[in-house]
């Protein structure tokens, strides 16, 4: 069965880049800009993994969405994406599984996805 990945990022070109790359590797990638309520989206799509941007352009940050995600599902893997080189949070304390620095080179993200899903 094809694994489903929910990509949440406010930047359209990032969503499209991630979706294209993930689908080329055989995953089913669903995207959101973060403006839709995350819990109904999770109920509808039932992702196996969430790739979540930390800095969204809406009223909520990715960390806010992560808290909502964890209120519904403690077990779904979440990879946080950031444009910042240094991420000053303890992943365990914020309930994330991994984080990656956004880059044109998606090898780090793909490595984490494969580690989780394969």
Enumerate the language-model features and the residues they cover.
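Two-component/phosphorelay signaling modules centered on CheY-like receiver
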Residues: 12-30
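Acidic, metal-coordinating helix/loop segments flanking the phosphotransfer/catalytic sites
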Residues: 31-49
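Active-site residues of response regulator receiver
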Residues: 53-54
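Hydrophobic/aromatic residues positioned on beta-strands within the core alpha/beta folds
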Residues: 79-81
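Short amphipathic alpha-helix used as the core "switch/output" element in two-component signaling
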Residues: 40, 61-74
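Alpha4 helix (beta4-alpha4-beta5 surface) of REC/receiver domains from two-component response regulators
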Residues: 64, 84-102, 107-111
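Conserved acidic carboxylate
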Residues: 9
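His-Asp phosphorelay/catalytic-motif detector in bacterial-type signaling
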Residues: 46-48, 72-77, 89
């Amino acid at each position: 069965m094809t694994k489903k990945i929910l990509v949440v990022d406010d930047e359209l070109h990032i969503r499209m880049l991630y979706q294209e790359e993930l689908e080329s590797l055989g995953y089913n990638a669903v995207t959101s800009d973060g403006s839709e309520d995350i819990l109904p989206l999770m109920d509808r799509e039932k992702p196996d993994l969430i790739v979540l941007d930390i800095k969204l352009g809406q009223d909520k940050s990715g960390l806010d969405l992560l808290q909502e995600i964890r209120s519904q599902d403690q077990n779904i893997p979440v990879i946080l994406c950031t444009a910042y080189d240094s991420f000053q949070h303890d992943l365990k304390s914020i309930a994330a599984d991994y984080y990656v620095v956004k880059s044109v080179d998606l090898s780090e993200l793909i490595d984490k996805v494969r580690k989780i899903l394969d």
